[in-house]
């Protein structure tokens, strides 16, 4: 079963948590869900060059807090913070309410599955050979501390007449193990020959405690540790 389902959905409530975190009263659920879809669609279009990994939406006390996880926060912020303020105003106007926009830097984009898939898609659109793009991304992930990596590309690879699927694996990716911290991301490369689909699984180790927020806490701790080591070196 672990081979078939989305690894993030399978681990929700075990060591992963939801990207939309709010409670809807009677008759409000559909409205809030459509707002979430519009917010994500708008941000992904506007920030397509900012390497956005995921967008978390929370709604405390009838407000809306949007947290964008990005590898390039400078692109989102803009000159003197002008771009992020414009985005915040547009989001507030779109949902007709107050919006707080926060940024979280992805410190290791090489082991973020969504960003790896996006990187491969961009390379394929630039006509880089698909095998080279897949191998390069896999080597970068393993070098940055991933325990295992699996990349699948499907479509008219190399401009072939007949579509096929190519797969590369390195290390272990235990999809059945619920305590395994597995990141999963997909992307589409729109090439002249047609669309090529990319799927990426990255195994980062095991999370032994039963904690839905464990993955986010580990990311935060690694960022703080890196900042401390930088200060000590200085």
From Swiss-Prot:
Keyword Nucleotide-binding: no
Annotated KH type-2 domain residues: 39-107
Region span, Disordered: 215-234
Basic and acidic residues bias locations: 215-227
Keywords tagged on the record: Ribonucleoprotein, Ribosomal protein, RNA-binding, rRNA-binding
Family affiliation: Belongs to the universal ribosomal protein uS3 family.
This protein's encoding gene: rpsC
Alphabetized Pfam families for the sequence: KH_2, Ribosomal_S3_C
Database matches in InterPro entries: KH_dom (IPR004087), KH_dom-like_a/b (IPR015946), KH_dom_type_2 (IPR004044), KH_sf_prok-type (IPR009019), Ribosomal_S3_C_sf (IPR036419), Ribosomal_uS3_bac-typ (IPR005704), Ribosomal_uS3_C (IPR001351), Ribosomal_uS3_CS (IPR018280)
PROSITE patterns registered for this protein in UniProt: KH_TYPE_2, RIBOSOMAL_S3
CDD domains per UniProt: KH-II_30S_S3
GO biological process: translation
PANTHER family: 30S/40S RIBOSOMAL PROTEIN S3, SMALL RIBOSOMAL SUBUNIT PROTEIN US3C
Protein role: Binds the lower part of the 30S subunit head. Binds mRNA in the 70S ribosome, positioning it for translation.
CC per GO annotation: cytosolic small ribosomal subunit
Protein name in UniProt: Small ribosomal subunit protein uS3
Keyword Magnesium: no
A single MF term (Gene Ontology): structural constituent of ribosome
The protein's assembly and partners: Part of the 30S ribosomal subunit. Forms a tight complex with proteins S10 and S14.
